């Protein structure tokens, strides 16, 4: 049981997991104290800090190599504002993956938040040979926004993924694994223990999905090796459990089915209401374009 208090005390806190949610909750709590709250935080998404700076709230940020030191003082009043939330890279990632896996394809996805703490997938895919560029870049309410142009490569390269990309791609790794399944060679992703703390143990489920598809994958408690097959075509039946209830596993499975073929039985489509209720409607427009 958690009971609220009207007299919050300022604290000093070390956030060492790279959790933007944890960091932001302490920042918001610090707004209501009568002192200075100090957070030493491992590098993670910084949307809250950018919004606070845009609103000219009393926040100070010192950036070091692996840590941010954030100071927040009491906030007496916040001016109201109108804010149109930009499109999210974690939703765009599914259509980026579909384009990359389709071959000889291009896509422009408009009005995406390209905050440097969010574009780990872009950095990873560029290392895998995918051509990606930002168009019409601008700053909106402190956040960098752009249209993203993606072109599928002739050959997807395998990679030994730098772990410093992890926090900026943590929600996109399932589709990154899917792309690695078609890469030439062995891809290795490390220090991914946080993936197993999501809606489902995604590192485990990512390896299961690849194995169902016929891809060799070796998984440990915090890493995965994926043995890519550029010629992969699925001709068997694959069933994804209705008890999983993970929106990203469901949507990744849809992209796999469209990209590699096979007979897929996907349950619990209601899970996509968590983040992307219009996903299947948009996917159907892709299918219709393909037919035309």
Which positions does each model-derived feature cover?
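Structural preference for solvent-exposed beta-strand-turn elements
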Residues: 1-292
């Amino acid at each position: 049981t958690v009971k609220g208090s009207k007299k919050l005390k300022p604290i000093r806190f070390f956030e060492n997991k790279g959790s933007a949610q944890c960091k932001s909750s302490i920042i918001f709590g610090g707004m209501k104290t009568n002192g200075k709250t100090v957070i030493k935080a491992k590098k993670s998404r910084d949307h809250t800090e950018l919004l606070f700076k845009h609103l000219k709230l009393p926040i100070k940020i010192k950036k070091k190599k692996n840590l941010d030191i954030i100071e927040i003082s009491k906030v007496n009043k916040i001016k109201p504002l109108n804010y149109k939330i930009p499109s999210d890279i974690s939703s765009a990632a599914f259509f980026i993956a579909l384009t990359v896996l389709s071959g000889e394809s291009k896509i422009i996805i408009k009005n995406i938040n390209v905050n440097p703490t969010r574009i780990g997938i872009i950095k990873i895919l560029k290392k895998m040979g995918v051509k990606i560029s930002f168009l019409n870049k601008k700053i909106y309410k402190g956040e960098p926004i752009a249209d993203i142009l993606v072109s599928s490569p002739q050959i997807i390269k395998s990679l030994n993924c730098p772990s410093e990309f992890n926090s900026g791609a943590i929600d996109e790794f399932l589709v990154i694994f899917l792309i690695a399944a078609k890469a030439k060679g062995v891809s290795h992703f490390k220090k991914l223990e946080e993936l197993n703390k999501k809606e489902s143990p995604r590192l485990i489920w990512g390896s299961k999905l690849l194995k169902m598809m016929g891809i060799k994958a070796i998984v440990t408690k915090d890493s995965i090796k994926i043995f890519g097959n550029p010629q992969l075509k699925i001709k068997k039946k694959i069933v994804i459990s209705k008890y999983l209830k993970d929106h990203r596993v469901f949507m990744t499975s849809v992209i796999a089915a469209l990209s590699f073929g096979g007979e897929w039985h996907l349950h619990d489509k209601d899970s996509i209401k968590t983040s992307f209720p219009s996903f299947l409607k948009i996917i159907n427009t892709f299918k219709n374009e393909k037919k035309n």
